[in-house]
Amino acid sequence: MCKTLHGTLLLLAIFVLFLNFSHATAKRTRRGMEIFEKNFIDKNKLKDVYDVFKYLYNTHSADTYLSNIKNESFTMNIWGFGEIEMVKTKCRKIDSDFYKCSFQREFYNLKRTPGETMYYISLPGSVRCRKLLSKLDNCPFEEQTEQLKREICYFVVYPDYIEQNIHAVRFDCYTK
């Protein structure tokens, strides 16, 4: 009788340990998935991405006028997807606009093909360029929309969920 009681208690103890272990594993797995559900890209981080893009776009543009973002949309899933419309403003581009601009970034690449420009920015950081950004904020858009050069840019934000930051951003711009 003693052997059967000890065997039953041993099996019961193993069963209880198994239940605790499986519950803890399921809880840990669920918590890991919550990282992907949480949108940590707030408006300030997205504004920094837009500012970096406006700086790069205007720096590498051969146009004599500055361009700014007219319309924007952004959706966050596992990656962030968005669309912006770059439109020419009435403000002329001059070299002093980019004076004392501090662009903090790890790496960026620019690739041009007819009708498309691709900007890839790794660790976008931010851009410190008060003069250019304040000028863009105060520049009205060109009003003659039928003659307006527009570019639609689709972008993907590649987040770093561990660091709760943006790892890279890729913009693909197409002339309309």
From Swiss-Prot:
Signal peptide: 1-26
Free-text tissue specificity from the UniProt record: Prostate and lacrimal gland.
GO CC, alphabetical: cytoplasm; extracellular region; extracellular space; vesicle
One MF term in the entry's GO annotations: cysteine-type endopeptidase inhibitor activity
Any one GO biological process: response to testosterone
Propeptide: 27-31
Induction of the gene: By androgens.
InterPro entries, A to Z: Cystatin_dom, Cystatin_sf
Record SUPFAM superfamilies: Cystatin/monellin (SSF54403)
Glycosylation sites recorded in the entry for this protein: N71
Disulfide bonding pattern of the chain: C129-C139, C153-C173
The family this protein is said to belong to: Belongs to the cystatin family.
Name of this protein: Cystatin-related protein 1
The species this protein was found in: Rattus norvegicus
